[in-house]
Each structure stands twice: as C-alpha cells, then as structure tokens.
C-alpha cells in the first residue's frame, strides 16, 4: 500500500502501526457472560395436559394459522398509501418475524411490496433492502438491487450504500468488501462519504487495520474529509479493544480536524473505561462531558450499570437507575434486562416485580431473560396469583416474548444463581394442570424454537443481532446479554427521524427521511452518515403497530 503525504493518513498510519502488536494481543475473543437458554416447554406442557403429541401438533397448527392471519392482515394494511409511509410499522412487523426466524415469511411480505407504485421510488426500495439486511438476508437485498432497472427504479449511490449496509448488518463482511470493490466501476457509481463510512464500520468489525488505512487513503484521494461518524467508528473499535492510548490519539486527531466529540464519542470512551473497571476515570469523564454542554443519555448510564452489574453491585446499579429517572430519562430494554435479573439474583423479589411492572408500563420490547426470572421465582415462592398477573399484564401490552416453564408440580429452579446472602428456598409449584396451561396460554406464542422456524432461508446462517447496528454488539462485549444489546447509542433517537409517523395522513408519499440524511448514533442528523442507523424502532418505542402484532 503506497504512502501518501496526507497528514491524516500519516498520523493514522503511525497510530495503527504502534498499536498493531497490542491489537493482535487484544484480538482474542472477549469472555462473554453466558446467557441461559430457556428452551420452550410448550410441547411438553401441552402433552402432559392434553392428548400427548396431538396437542402439540394442534398448538403448532394454531400458531401457524395465527401467523398466516397476521401476515394477510399486514398485506391488506399495505394497500393504504399512508400506511406504507410509516416506517416503524414495517420495522416492528419484520422484527417480530425475524425473532421468530420466519425468514420465508419475511421474504413473502417484502416481495409483496413490489405490487405498489412506490417500488419505483429508490427510497422505498432502500427501506426494503435495509429490512432484508437486518434480517440477515443480504442476498435477497442484492437480488432486489439487481432488479431495480426492471422495476423502473433508478439506481444511485444511495441504493448502493444500502446494499453495502445490508451485507454489513448481515455480518457478511467479505461480501461487502467484494461488492465495494467491484460494483462501482461496473455500474458507473461514484462512492460518497456514506460509502466509505459504511466500509470503515465493516472493516472495524473485521479488525483489519491495514484495510481501514486503505479506505482512508482512498477517501482522501477522492477529495473527501472524514466526518464525526468516521472517527466515532474508529473510537468505538479502539476503546472496545481497550487500546486507550491509541484511542486517545484518535480523539486528539479528531479534535485537530475541528470536529467536536458528541455523545456517541463520549459514550465509547466511557464504555471502554467501565469495561476496564476504571470507574473514577469514567465518572470524571462524564463530568467533563457535562462541562462541554453534553448531557449523559440512557446509554451513558447503561455503560455504568453494565460494569456495576458485573461486580454484582446492586447499590450502585440502583443509584444509576434512580439518577437516570430523576433526570427525565426513560430506561430502555438494555437497562431492564440488566436490572431485573440482578434484583432476582440478590433476592429482592418485591422490587423485581415493581421494576418489571414499570418496564411493562413503558411498553418496552422485552427479551426472554427480562421477565422470566421474576415469574419463575414468584412461582417457586407459591405466588401463583402474582405470577399470573405479571404475565397477563405483559400479554395485554403484547410485549411478553417468552414461554416460561410453568409445568404443573415441577420444582422450580432459578435461571440465575442466587447469592448465598440472599438465597431463597425454591418450593414445588402446587399449581394445577389448568393453572399451568392457563399461564402458558397467556404467553406470547411467537416462539423462536427451531421446530417452528424457517431453516431454509439462504441467508439465515449468519447471526443477526437484535438491534440493527451491532458495531459494538454483544459478541464483542462481555457485559451484555446476547439477546439484546447492539449499537449502544442507536436506540433513543431513531424514531424521531427515520420512523416519524407524523406523515401517516400525508396526501403523498415521503420516504426522504430514510435516505436523505442518516442518524449519527447520538441522534443528531448528519448529512454524511452511513446507513447503519436502525431501521427498527427504538427499544423504547411504544408503537404496537395498530394492533397488527397483537396476539
């Protein structure tokens, strides 16, 4: 790779060169907190109550029938032009299908969109491509990209960038690089800064410093200047690898370019410090952030909560949680997925129930490890009514997404170990078969077990994070549950721009928000972002898709 006279390139080259040994040492996989898998007991439970295997088959047939009804209802809703403009409705529906691994159904729903004139709009096609990408179906996105001329839809650098993002979010990084190298010249497309930012993110995930340097060299050679997103992506990677010296040099380099750090920049640094248990430094940095006029957000507090949770420090976790609420911030799914199991682990069942009810009240998108420990401990303590009420409340909000094991007469064991100081004795559940069956029937039947999922998806082999942007996904962080955390800063702001429903009654389609500008993870709109911003509603989204997703 040839050297150029660019001061930016030279300085980056020096930073990367000095960190190459450290990078190699730190590239080993981070130890992850193993998340307990809770296999669905639906079949076993129904078999014990009903007619054996026949009951299980009937339940499966019933679930498939309900899914078919929902899909048909969604298709009918798509006939409305105003419905097609509300991005969040599509995103929420596809998210549910993806979590249930219904890949063929995802393809059916997205293919159905070709019947509308909107398909001639590049922005509308981009939305579909991104939904494919976040479902781990990048090959489908590429096929749609190839079909655009036949659909009388113009192909520009915007749809090309969406294709790259589809590969990146499907974790098919080699294919993304191949597409980046081959298609622009073949199709006469000139890459822009969004293109380069997307590839910087892909290469950071891959851990290829030499290739990142090549991208920066090409970027400058073509007359572009790295923006805040370019540097934030690098900062996230260096601090994730705990390369603080090199990360701080990137920080200084960014400021020398007259780019002021934003909330995402600070959050990357805070996460790096808390992962290394440098709590005092992290708190001091937050104070500096405040003096710069930048207020901590939910993700700042989540970084602190994550670190304190690893140390089983419930007192500090609750302090952060309460301070967050005092400042008018609404805890998100990540917050509750860390807090609720920790409360159960410490034996504080009453407060765990209280916090669970609060999460349900906020209509948060839940995860299997979020409420299950509470329900199991309530059942283990013989508090059948409270367990029933908790499940019912979640069911009414359509946000319970697990099938707890509430088999009759079975001794309950906790999903997470109880500390010796707060250990409680589990007692056999004396609920009758009818009670168990009733509680199971209250649970949302969107089971993602392999027996009910599509295994034929051509792209389903790739692991897809729950949240679209996984530049700092759980796979790289030992402090997060594998079922939820991804881009730490992408959840709170997306709905305000990409998925605003204020245009629902508009007389003409407007898809510009999905492509004309992308979100930096802090929520500030940047004209030169990448397409890594979430297509899905935020974790705090209260949209229930007008009942389309209700069971």
From Swiss-Prot:
**Residue spans of biased composition, Polar residues class:** 29-48
Q: Does the keyword Repeat apply?
A: yes
Stretches of Low complexity bias are at 415-435
Keyword Repeat assigned? yes
Cross-referenced Pfam families: PPR, PPR_2
Q: Where is the composition biased (Basic and acidic residues)?
A: 58-67
Keywords of the record: Repeat
PPR repeat locations: 121-155, 156-191, 192-226, 227-261, 262-296, 297-331, 332-366
Region (Disordered) residue ranges read: 22-67, 409-435, 449-551
Q: Name one GO molecular function term.
A: mRNA binding
Q: Which NCBIfam families match?
A: PPR
Q: Which family does it belong to?
A: Belongs to the PPR family. P subfamily.
Please state what the protein is called: Pentatricopeptide repeat-containing protein At3g13150
């Amino acid at each position: 790779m040839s050297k150029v006279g660019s001061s930016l390139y030279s300085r980056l080259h020096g930073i990367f060169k000095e960190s190459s040994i450290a990078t190699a040492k730190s590239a080993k996989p981070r130890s992850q907190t193993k998340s307990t898998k809770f296999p669905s007991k639906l079949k076993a439970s129904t078999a014990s109550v009903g007619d054996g295997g026949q009951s299980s088959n009937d339940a499966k047939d019933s679930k498939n029938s309900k899914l078919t009804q929902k899909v048909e209802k969604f298709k009918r809703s798509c006939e409305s032009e105003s419905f097609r403009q509300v991005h969040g409705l599509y995103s929420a529906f596809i998210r549910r299908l993806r979590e249930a691994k219904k890949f063929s159904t995802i393809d059916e729903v997205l293919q159905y969109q070709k019947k509308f004139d909107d398909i001639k709009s590049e922005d509308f096609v981009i939305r579909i491509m991104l939904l494919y990408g976040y479902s781990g179906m990048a090959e489908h996105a590429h096929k749609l990209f190839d079909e655009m001329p036949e659909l009388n839809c113009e192909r520009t650098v915007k749809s090309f960038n969406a294709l790259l993002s589809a590969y990146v979010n499907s974790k098919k990084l080699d294919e993304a690089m191949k597409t980046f190298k081959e298609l622009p010249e073949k199709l006469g497309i000139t890459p822009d800064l969004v293109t380069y930012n997307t590839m910087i993110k892909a290469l950071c995930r891959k851990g290829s410093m030499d290739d990142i340097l090549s991208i920066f060299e090409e970027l400058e050679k073509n007359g572009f200047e790295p923006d805040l997103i370019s540097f934030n992506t690098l900062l996230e990677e260096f601090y994730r690898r705990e390369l603080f010296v090199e990360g701080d040099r990137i920080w200084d380099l960014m400021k020398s370019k007259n780019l002021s750090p934003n909330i995402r920049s600070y959050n990357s640094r805070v996460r790096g410090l808390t992962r290394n248990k440098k709590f005092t430094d992290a708190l001091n940095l937050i104070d500096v952030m405040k003096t710069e006029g930048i207020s901590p957000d939910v993700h700042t507090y989540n970084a602190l909560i994550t670190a304190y949770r690893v140390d089983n420090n419930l007192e500090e976790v609750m302090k952060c949680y309460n301070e967050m609420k005092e400042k008018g911030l609404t805890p998100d799914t990540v917050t509750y997925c860390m807090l609720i199991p920790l409360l159960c682990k410490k034996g504080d069942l009453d407060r765990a129930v209280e916090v669970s009810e609060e999460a349900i009240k906020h209509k948060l998108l839940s995860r299997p490890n979020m409420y299950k420990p509470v329900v199991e401990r309530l059942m283990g303590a013989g508090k059948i009514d409270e367990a029933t009420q908790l499940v019912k409340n979640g069911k009414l909000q359509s946000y319970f997404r697990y099938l707890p094991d509430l088999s009759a007469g079975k001794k309950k064991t906790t999903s997470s170990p109880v500390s010796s100081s707060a250990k409680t004795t589990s007692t056999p559940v004396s609920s009758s078969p009818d009670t168990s069956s009733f509680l199971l029937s209250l649970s949302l039947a969107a089971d993602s077990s392999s027996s009910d999922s599509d295994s034929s998806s051509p792209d389903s082999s790739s692991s897809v994070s729950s949240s679209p942007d996984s530049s700092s996904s759980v796979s790289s962080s030992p402090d997060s549950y594998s079922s939820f955390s991804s881009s730490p800063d992408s959840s709170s702001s997306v709905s305000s721009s990409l998925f605003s429903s204020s245009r629902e009654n508009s007389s003409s389609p407007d898809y510009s928000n999905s492509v004309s500008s992308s979100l930096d993870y802090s929520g500030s709109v940047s004209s030169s972002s990448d397409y890594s911003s979430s297509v899905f509603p935020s974790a705090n989204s209260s949209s229930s898709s007008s009942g389309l997703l209700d069971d």
